[in-house]
Amino acid sequence: MKTLLRRLYGKQKTAAPADLDSYDRKVSTLRQQLPDATEQDCELIAAVQHLTMTSPERILALVNAVSYLATNQIEGDFVECGVWKGGSMVATANTLIAHGDTDRRLWLYDTFEGMSEPTEEDVDFMGQSADRLLGEQDRLQSDSIWCFSPLEQVRAVMQDTGYPESKVNFVQGKVEDTLPQTKPESIALLRLDTDWYESTRCELEHLFPRMVDGAVLIVDDYLSLIHI
């Protein structure tokens, strides 16, 4: 596991020693930051941090949710809406592999072209519109708030996890367009991270009814905007 995670942190190619030193330092820091996390948890979180904007605490919560579902054999697919570079699903896939649970289908919904435009509903608690905030960012910069990351890059990091490729579904496009046509029959884990009101509402309308008993729902942007 540690060799795989060090390779992930090294961006799948031969990593420079400085990169691996940085990875080891991150693991050490996470041990102190997350006292309830296992050594394996810290290694995994350190390995995916360059692939996600999600905090270590939230990644750990996701890993714990996946472990709960695998340990209790709660059947159903795992779904993420709003993938960006794939960090959360990489953490999910690695956790499933660690539990010997590789028969589940993983669904990754994203435009893979950056975030869709916000609407007038997307206002923070300070009264600032998301449209104004995004207007200050370069849409094509991968680390900007627009969250641009091409499908090919996300597919590559998912392949590097070793999770069966036949079980990984990439659904490209706005969820408002794709979900009415393409969605799983049953869901054990539903993680929503598309930020905006309209997309989140669409996801809940189409996917929440398909969640099985004992399933886990994670809304990453809950209370980040007035209407979410």
Q: How would you label these PLM feature ranges?
A:
Residues 56-150:
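SAM cofactor-binding core of SAM-dependent methyltransferases
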Residues 28-74:
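Class I SAM-dependent methyltransferase Rossmann-like catalytic core
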Residues 1-41, 45-46:
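Membrane-proximal basic amphipathic "stem/tether" segments
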Residues 65-68, 95-98, 156-160, 178, ...:
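A generic secondary-structure signal
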Residues 226-228:
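Conserved small/polar residues in nucleotide/adenosyl-binding loops
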Residues 147-159:
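Short alpha-helix
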Residues 102-104, 163-169:
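A short helix-to-beta-strand connector/capping loop
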Residues 166-224:
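Active-site segment flanking the S-adenosylmethionine/decSAM binding pocket
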